[in-house]
């Protein structure tokens, strides 16, 4: 009995240690979130580093009000950039992935390799040529220019995700569609698109998060009237002339992070389904 019970106790101990370690990491993650939330609801005279751990003596939304006033233009710009850019890049990536996996043509492997190569080119390497291109197109400093930059840079990863996802779809479905006389677009619309929800969820979350959190493109290619929330947040952090307004800064950080959290909460189950279905598998 003792020999049989020992492995069970050992396994239980290992599981308990794993649970304690995981809870410790969760706690380390939640501590800054706690400070953010608590400080954002403090009046200005209570919001200072010495009392960061304490609850507000007087709960106030003044920090949220001032944060909203300061970030609203940036939030609107970020929504325009991230929503339109993620949808466009996902659609283009889906079409590319379909052609490269199911409607192949001579040289398809070379084209796919070039797409993969584009994933490994750092932003900094193309920033100056990209700025010159947008200037020539009269899109420099505009929201449309930022959307174009993000879409172009997001197409390679979107193409990879969709191509690897579509590889898992049986070729017999495509052949049956061809036998019925359907062309490329009809096959894509009737056969491929209805089963593409998991891959779209992966690419939309990926691209939305990337575009929402972008700072470098926005600063280098944007202008004050097209700056997204990340740039506005940076300006807010350095806008205190006399004293740092910690309540406003914490509320601003929370406001800037809420949209990406909401997107993941809404599409998270599809995101995991897309990963499990092979969206990121070779």
Write out the residue ranges for each language-model feature.
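Short, Lys/Arg-rich, polar N-terminal cytosolic tail immediately upstream
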Residues: 1-12
């Amino acid at each position: 009995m003792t020999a049989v019970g020992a492995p069970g106790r050992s396994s239980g101990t290992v599981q308990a240690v794993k649970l304690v370690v995981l809870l410790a990491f969760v706690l380390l993650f939640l501590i800054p979130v706690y400070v953010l939330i608590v400080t954002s609801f403090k009046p200005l005279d209570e919001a200072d580093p010495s009392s960061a751990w304490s609850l507000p003596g007087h709960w106030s939304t003044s920090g949220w009000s001032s944060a909203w006033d300061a970030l609203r233009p940036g939030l609107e710009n970020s929504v325009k950039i991230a929503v339109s850019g993620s949808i466009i890049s996902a659609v283009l990536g889906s079409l590319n992935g379909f052609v490269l996996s199911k409607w192949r043509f001579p040289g398809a492997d070379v084209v796919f390799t070039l797409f993969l190569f584009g994933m490994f080119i750092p932003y900094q390497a193309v920033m100056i040529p990209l700025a010159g291109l947008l200037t020539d197109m009269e899109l420099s400093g505009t929201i449309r220019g930022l959307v174009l930059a993000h879409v172009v840079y997001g197409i390679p990863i979107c193409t990879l995700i969709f191509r690897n996802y579509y590889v898992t779809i049986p070729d017999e479905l495509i052949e049956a569609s061809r036998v019925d006389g359907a062309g490329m677009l009809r096959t894509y619309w009737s056969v491929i698109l209805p089963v593409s929800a998991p891959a779209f969820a992966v690419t939309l979350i990926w691209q939305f998060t990337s575009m929402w959190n972008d700072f470098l493109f926005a600063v280098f290619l944007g202008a004050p009237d097209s700056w997204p929330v990340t740039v506005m947040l940076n300006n807010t952090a350095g806008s205190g002339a006399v004293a740092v307004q910690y309540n406003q800064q914490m509320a601003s950080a929370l406001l800037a992070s809420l949209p990406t959290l909401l997107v993941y909460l809404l599409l998270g189950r599809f995101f995991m389904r897309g990963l499990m279905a092979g969206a990121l598998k070779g």
